[in-house]
């Protein structure tokens, strides 16, 4: 049971059945999940029933979490077919932008992000200015100073020519199921439309946690997974341009994640909000790191 969703399971004569009830602010997950299952039934959970009005999903079991294969062994090879298939899905889903946006998921495409960033800086409460774990006045000034540079980063990333698509929003090893060679992607409650490479942020953070790595460490095995992910996108740009696009996507992904958390925290009650409020300023510090790395 979480603020954003409740999940329960029960055994049946047809195997384990899962029920999910999402919070009102995540109601778009229901319609999106239904659409994804319609377009890519072999890659998504099999739905038994949905109730879009109440935010309910009833789903069949699709195997064990990818995490159960990775964390005990510290072997990230099980990610190989997953990250390749995820890239293929993103490319295919780029043809369904209007339909996905019509489900109500957030529009965080590159053209809109500079304004969203400016609006974020106006929300002093979310930035926790001058508070413990919040932004200092110097950090806030740095945020302001980076506005025009961030706008240019978004423009440069768009210029590479990779179509925007679905970003899972929480693409880690507990949100992928595997069973008899079948890969299932699920839990689309944090999804939005933005640059596809934004998904790589949480993907690599998940690997950092699996391997007990320090932040921003990039191992040869992680580089291999990046190569595998980028390969399908070579239809849009040369490999060197794709690597440059990945670097440009890093500060963008920090801002997309910041906005997602800010909107989620705003919906929390006064008891729960302090537990998560620090995440917004911390993600902005991550943004600083990636912007500095580009200069």
Task: Show where each model-derived region lies.
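Regulatory N- and C-terminal appendages and interdomain linkers associated
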Residues: 263-295
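Protein kinase glycine-rich loop
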Residues: 1
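A cross-family kinase active-site recognition segment
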Residues: 73-141, 164, 192, 276-278
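Active-site activation/catalytic loop segments of kinase-like enzymes and analogous catalytic loops
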Residues: 196-236, 251-271, 283
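ATP-binding pocket architecture of kinase catalytic cores
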Residues: 4-108
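Active-site acidic catalytic loop and adjacent metal/ATP-binding pocket
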Residues: 4-13, 19, 148-200
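A glycine-centered beta->alpha junction motif in the catalytic cores
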Residues: 59-75, 91-95, 118-132, 206-209, ...
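All-alpha amphipathic helical-bundle segments outside canonical DNA-binding/catalytic cores
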Residues: 104, 108, 238-251
């Amino acid at each position: 049971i979480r603020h954003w969703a409740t999940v329960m399971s029960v055994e049946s004569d047809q195997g384990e059945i899962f029920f999910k009830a999402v919070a009102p602010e995540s109601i778009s997950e229901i319609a999106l999940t239904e659409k994804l299952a319609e377009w890519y039934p072999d890659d998504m959970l099999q739905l038994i029933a949905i109730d879009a009005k109440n935010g309910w999903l009833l789903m069949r079991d699709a195997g064990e979490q990818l995490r159960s294969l990775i964390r005990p062994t510290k072997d990230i090879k099980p990610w190989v077919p997953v990250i390749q298939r995820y890239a293929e899905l993103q490319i295919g889903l780029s043809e369904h932008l209007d339909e996905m946006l019509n489900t109500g998921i957030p529009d965080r495409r590159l053209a809109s992000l500079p304004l969203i960033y400016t609006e974020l800086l106006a929300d002093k409460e979310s930035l926790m200015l001058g508070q413990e774990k919040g932004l200092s006045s110097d950090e806030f000034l740095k945020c302001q100073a980076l506005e025009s540079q961030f706008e240019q980063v978004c423009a440069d990333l768009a210029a590479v020519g990779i179509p925007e698509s679905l970003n899972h929003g929480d693409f880690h090893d507990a949100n992928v199921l595997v069973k008899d060679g079948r890969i299932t992607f699920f839990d689309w409650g944090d999804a939005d439309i933005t640059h596809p490479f934004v998904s790589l942020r949480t993907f690599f953070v998940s690997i950092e946690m699996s391997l007990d790595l320090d932040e921003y460490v990039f191992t040869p095995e992680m580089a291999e997974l990046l190569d595998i992910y980028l390969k399908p996108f070579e239809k849009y740009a040369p490999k060197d341009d794709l690597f440059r696009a990945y670097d440009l996507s890093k500060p963008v992904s920090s801002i997309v994640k910041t906005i997602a958390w800010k909107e989620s925290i705003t919906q929390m009650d006064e008891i729960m909000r302090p537990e998560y409020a620090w995440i917004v300023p911390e993600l902005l510090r991550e943004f600083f790191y990636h912007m500095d790395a580009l200069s």
